[in-house]
Swiss-Prot record:
GO function term, MF aspect, one: mannonate dehydratase activity
Family the entry assigns: Belongs to the mannonate dehydratase family.
Keywords, in A-Z order: Iron, Lyase, Manganese
NCBIfam families on file: PRK03906.1 (NF003027), uxuA (TIGR00695)
This protein's name: Mannonate dehydratase
Pathway: Carbohydrate metabolism; pentose and glucuronate interconversion
Protein's UniProt keywords contain Flavoprotein: no
Length: 352
């Protein structure tokens, strides 16, 4: 079980994370290097040393961002891809085994509220389709999850560049990228794990190509090797009513292509609105127990984190990344796994 940590500026300390039963690994990254630059080996080594001094392990990076010029397929992408490959080598040399990344144009995860109040008084991240439909990014209006490093005119120019990039072009650019980096990842002993689009649908006319079962199947076929794998995020994919997360885990888990599991719950409305809930199955639209069983049945040996959490018990900090609810989620997931391991006598694929 792993836990995301945003470095020394994170209000959640490594000391507190270490106290969560069953949490052994930290998921982190180098946050002060510009996108597209090589992550220096000495910074990676220093991060690893900090984590290990706290009695935890560092084997998963989330994320190494992909420069927009690579997604756009611009002429300068080869230099940026070379930088990405060198970062993979540095991470592999430091003992990192999985790198999570995404291929979402312009915007990373998108939410319309960071602190929606739930019936129990806790607050959560939420997404409203109507709110997004009323927004024109060209007007300079921002939403949570957007890259704040873009000035309004820069964002407008970037969006203009994507007007000529449809799904087919984005697929071609992802294929070019994967064929360039996966052989290096294999040599470095690293598995790449692409994260689904969040939410799993086009927004603002931008193409999205990591949103459902067919997209995931196409991605793993582009370079058909275990080093080209998935971060299967139940919350991101589960926000799309068409996605059967349990079935996705069974299919791609049986293939050995899920290297990183983000397990969290969401409550999804018929119109596509959703809010992030407690991990417990009854709190949201996903059967978390069935999802965890699917991982168990397919012999999953990768990395897991509870992903996001609500803000509870008066905690403040980075929305979605407080200590308390994520800790509850980690313990809940570990409890499900322990029960399956001890009492489910159905052989897993790993023992058949």
């Amino acid at each position: 079980m792993s836990f995301r940590w945003y470095g020394e500026s994170d209000p959640v300390s490594l000391q507190y994370i270490r106290q969560i039963p069953g949490v052994t690994h930290i998921v982190s990254a180098i946050y002060d290097e510009p996108v597209g630059e090589v992550w220096p080996a000495h910074k990676i080594d220093a991060l690893k040393a900090t984590i290990e001094r706290a009695g935890l392990q560092f084997e998963v990076v989330e994320s190494v961002p992909v420069h927009e010029d690579i997604k756009l397929g611009k002429p300068g992408r080869d230099r940026l891809i070379d930088h990405y490959r060198q970062t993979i080598r540095h991470l592999g040399a430091a003992g990192v085994r999985v790198i999570c990344y995404n291929f979402m144009p312009v915007f990373d995860w998108t939410r319309t509220e960071l602190s929606k109040t739930l019936d129990d008084g806790s607050t959560c991240l939420a997404f409203s389709t109507d709110a997004v439909d009323r927004i024109d990014p060209d007007d300079g209006i921002a939403l949570p999850g957007w890259d704040s490093s873009y000035q309004p005119e820069q964002l407008k120019a970037l969006l203009a560049e994507y007007r000529d990039v449809d799904e087919a072009a984005l697929w071609a650019n992802l294929e070019y990228f994967l064929k360039a980096i996966i052989p290096v990842a294999e040599e470095a002993g690293v598995k790449m794990a692409i994260h689904p689009d969040d939410p799993p649908r086009p927004i603002f006319g931008l193409p999205r190509i990591v949103k459902n079962r067919d997209d995931l199947a196409r991605i793993v076929r582009i370079v058909d090797t275990p080093a080209n794998g998935l971060t299967l995020c139940s919350g991101s994919l589960g926000a799309g009513p068409q996605n059967d997360v349990e079935a996705l885990v069974r299919e791609f888990g049986a293939m050995g292509r899920i290297h990183f599991a983000h397990i969290r719950n969401v409550k999804v409305d018929a119109n596509g609105d959703f809010e992030e809930t407690a991990h417990l199955s009854s709190c949201g639209s996903l059967d978390i127990a069935a999802i965890v069983k699917a991982y168990h049945d397919t012999g999953f040996t990768g990395y897991v984190r509870p992903d996001h959490g609500r803000m509870i018990w008066g905690e403040t900090g980075k929305p979605g990344y407080g200590l308390y609810d994520r800790a509850l989620g980690a313990v809940y997931l570990n409890g499900l796994w322990e029960a399956l391991a001890k009492f489910d006598r159905t052989p897993s694929l790993a023992t058949q």
